[in-house]
């Protein structure tokens, strides 16, 4: 089994990742970068339903920390285009299901890496949430659910990152849909759902995500400061050590 550093080094040298960085203003480039392969290739699409193939990608998505922040910088102009008025990320490519998914990944995943530690890391969250709701509305749901499991795994995170607990309830509903389509892809019932539950617990406790306070210029309460200092009870995704399958105290 490869260790984290080996996975990261292979990702940085992957030809589809490098090609995506040369043409970042393209939905296929966003998808290829996130999936570390040619997502237009039927064999690659099929492989993205295999948990053994997808598991190393979890390192890229959730354990890479700052190590890939510099690599993804070419996506910054495209991320910022999400807020352009009038809208510029439009047309057949961007308005397709794949295009909408790519915009979610730009707004929710890549923005956090491109702008880590600043308020801009969260500036595109509303765009990502609205797009996920659109992807799973009555009109688009069936088409969206045809996408590979790895892609579907990433979409609920845009809702889990919301500080509106109703969005997290929607995230759980989406996960239930994906479980029915891919019952053998255990990351949905496992890590995906567990992460949403943990995010819910934080919102129920504080009404917001305290680990964002510094970046957003918010003043932490005494209770929030105490929690942020308690690394053993602070989730990994908030900078602590608490595993994703354990409850917040």
Predicted regions and their residues:
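Intrinsically disordered, low-complexity activation-like regions
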Residues: 1-102, 106-249
